[in-house]
Amino acid sequence: MPHHIMSINDSNHVQIGGRKSKLAVVQSEIVKKVIEDTFPNLSCSILALSTLGDKVQTQPLYTFGGKSLWTKELEILLLDSVDEFPKLDLIVHSLKDMPTNLPEEFELGCIFQREDPRDAIVMKQGSSYKSLKDLPAGAIVGTSSIRRSSQLIKNYPHLRFESVRGNIQTRLNKLDQPNNEYCCLILASAGLIRLGLGHRITSYLDDMYYAVGQGALGIEIRKGDDNIKSILKKIEDPIATICCLAERSLMRYLEGGCSVPLGVHSDYNESKQELTLKGIIVSPDGTVSIEDEVIKRITCDEDCEQVGIELGDKLKAKGAKEILDKIDMTRNINARPTEV
């Protein structure tokens, strides 16, 4: 049902910001449409901007160590306009790229529309292979994620896993080149589906733990902006919020960013009001893995936060922190200054 609100900043206009990639623009457009459909008296416009994570395409993500590769430039515009760029009212993120600890001036306004969170296998066009187990020994699988590669090395030791960067279409173009060494790619199914590329999905990795927040959109706002909050309250996804708050609490507790090998699986039973959160940490070489789960009845956001903390304690007790500390040491050794 449409809603009407008081004007925002003396106008009925909402300025949305997002990254410049095709997927990011599609996601911003999804939010724009839902806001305008829900609030007919509002109009929205979108500013698409390149970020550090977009500009540096030659290094594996885990070597950066930064937790705000995809957010920092946009956050500046949440505070004020800069040159020809307008002040933003909200930023649309892929939630999995959004830091769990935001600068004190900002907050997570809402969690919106979780698409299928699973990872997917995309085979080279014309390939007869359907699954990773069918691939010959030494076949090269492309993935941008240490979380994916560490789990897959553990389960498919006969394969080689190589980093591949770039937006989804760039990666697919690389894959389909006849002389390219990659047999397939591992990608988030949500991005493929949102871009209308669901037909490229060969199969789903049902047993693989996905990234924290994968498939969901996170909307970042200025802290205390009650007008924008009142809009977002009407469009949030309640079940995705429960699951993703718990997932993000776990990552925060383990002090991880989007470049650590933490995988999760969450499921909320509405009739029981019960959340099941599973988590896994795998060493980059796939030789050591630690997993556990927590099941808890949810009555408020604080319960979601507690689920993440409880699971974090269980994983730490089994040695998760040691794996993460070793990754930090490797990252610090490999880090190099990068021009952007």
Curated annotation (Swiss-Prot):
Sites of S-(dipyrrolylmethanemethyl)cysteine modification: 258
Cofactor: binding comment: Binds 1 dipyrromethane group covalently.
Names of required cofactors: dipyrromethane
The EC number(s) this enzyme carries: 2.5.1.61
Enzyme's top EC category: transferase
Reactions performed catalytically: 4 porphobilinogen + H2O = hydroxymethylbilane + 4 NH4(+)
Domain of life: Eukaryota
Keywords for this protein: Heme biosynthesis, Porphyrin biosynthesis, Transferase
InterPro entries: HemC, Porphobilin_deaminase_cofac_BS, Porphobilin_deaminase_N, Porphobilinogen_deaminase_C, Porphobilinogen_deaminase_C_sf
GO MF term (any one): hydroxymethylbilane synthase activity
GO cellular component annotations of the record: cytoplasm
Pathway terms, separated by semicolons: Porphyrin-containing compound metabolism; protoporphyrin-IX biosynthesis; coproporphyrinogen-III from 5-aminolevulinate: step 2/4
Biological processes, Gene Ontology terms: heme biosynthetic process; protoporphyrinogen IX biosynthetic process
Function: Tetrapolymerization of the monopyrrole PBG into the hydroxymethylbilane pre-uroporphyrinogen in several discrete steps.
Note: The porphobilinogen subunits are added to the dipyrromethan group.
NCBIfam families given in the database record: hemC
Family: Belongs to the HMBS family.
Entries under PANTHER family matching the protein: PORPHOBILINOGEN DEAMINASE
Designated name of the protein: Porphobilinogen deaminase
Source species of the chain: Candida albicans (strain SC5314 / ATCC MYA-2876) (Yeast)
Source lineage: Eukaryota, Fungi, Dikarya, Ascomycota, Saccharomycotina
